[in-house]
Amino acid sequence: MAEILMGVGNAGLKESGNPDILVVYLPYPCTASFVFTDNYFKAGSVIYSERIARDKERIRAFVVNSGNANCGTGEEGIKHAEMMAEKVAQILDIPKDEVFVFSTGIIGKYLPIENVLKGIEQACSNLELLDLKRASEVISTTDRFPKYDFAKAGEVETFGFAKGAGMIHPSMATMLAFVFTNANLEYLTLKRIHESVTEKTFNSITVDGCESTNDAFGIISLGEVEADPETVEFELLKVSESLAKQIVADGEGATKIIRVNVRSAITEIKAREIAEAIANSLLVKTAVFGRDPNWGRIAAAAGSTEFPIDPFKLEIYVGGYLLYDGKPHDENLEKAKKHLIEDREVDITVELNEGEYEWVCYSSDIGYDYIKLNAEYTT
């Protein structure tokens, strides 16, 4: 396995005083694909890195600062992102256009750029082997725990780390995620796989329905082994789904992961829209927090999209227990309630009984601590 290096620095961006600068240094230029937030109010680092990604298919290093989003800071914010890339490139003696920049944290404050550049110098002077757990900790903001995973299938190794807990909503979330594969992938193949994986994972999670200004998800191919693209895609999907679920599990104030599976739809887009409506419903989320198998809220959310549903064909299951199929099944309410109380992952399945398409979204419950945390944390 190629030696990926990382360095950690401190620019004083976090109130806790914890390290807030991460530099990841690849042993050679690697094929990479990135997707960024769809939010029009983009951070300076997103604007800068998007410009590079449009013209560049390879990456040699990336730098992340945590604690300051560098967003709402105008042209100066973009310039600061460029200065961060320049500093990494200068110290590591690599092309500036092979250095990507990412920021996460509080919106609307200028980066103390001199401190950030000193933090980058510190990080680049203390390079060591990539530690997924440590990397996730450095880029975290309101996260309660680090997010990382590793998978191996034959010679194919897939691994990554992420951050995210609030402002989680499809397209994408308040999240950063970086996933690596040792498989050799041409750029167009990687891009196709990346788009598919993104839609099924990070674009199918929600915590609070709030879309962030700083999101990015990158997949980097180290090009060490030849492998079937389908195998590589499966492994990338597995690790990315794990990271996405960890983000949902860490939803601010969350006590449960909610898996919403809408099945037997006439089209995939219909299945997805209905799944997202249920996953985003505050009434569904609060019912789960209260351990209440309230299938009526699920039905109401399912019927709230532009796509019609037939209430006489509709089936609703919680924890595998049928609660509605054109009529209530109150005899299963206590079993469903027990599932909500005892299981960390709550399963909600909706059968439309009209076609063959399905979609899965992951969400979290929402309770008192979400309000407390976000009332006390400046965005």
From Swiss-Prot:
Pathway info: Amino-acid biosynthesis; L-arginine biosynthesis; L-ornithine and N-acetyl-L-glutamate from L-glutamate and N(2)-acetyl-L-ornithine (cyclic): step 1/1; Amino-acid biosynthesis; L-arginine biosynthesis; N(2)-acetyl-L-ornithine from L-glutamate: step 1/4
Similarity section: Belongs to the ArgJ family.
EC class (word): transferase
This protein's name: Arginine biosynthesis bifunctional protein ArgJ
Compartments (UniProt record): Cytoplasm
Function recorded in the entry: Catalyzes two activities which are involved in the cyclic version of arginine biosynthesis: the synthesis of N-acetylglutamate from glutamate and acetyl-CoA as the acetyl donor, and of ornithine by transacetylation between N(2)-acetylornithine and glutamate.
Stored InterPro entries: Arg_biosynth_ArgJ, ArgJ-like_dom_sf, ArgJ_beta_C
Gene3D superfamilies linked to this entry: ArgJ beta chain, C-terminal domain (3.10.20.340), L-amino peptidase D-ALA esterase/amidase (3.60.70.12)
Domain of life: Bacteria
HAMAP family: ArgJ
An example molecular function term from Gene Ontology annotations: L-glutamate N-acetyltransferase activity
Entry-linked NCBIfam families: ArgJ (TIGR00120), PRK05388.1 (NF003802)
Gene (name only): argJ
The enzyme's E.C. designation: 2.3.1.35, 2.3.1.1
GO biological process: L-arginine biosynthetic process; ornithine biosynthetic process
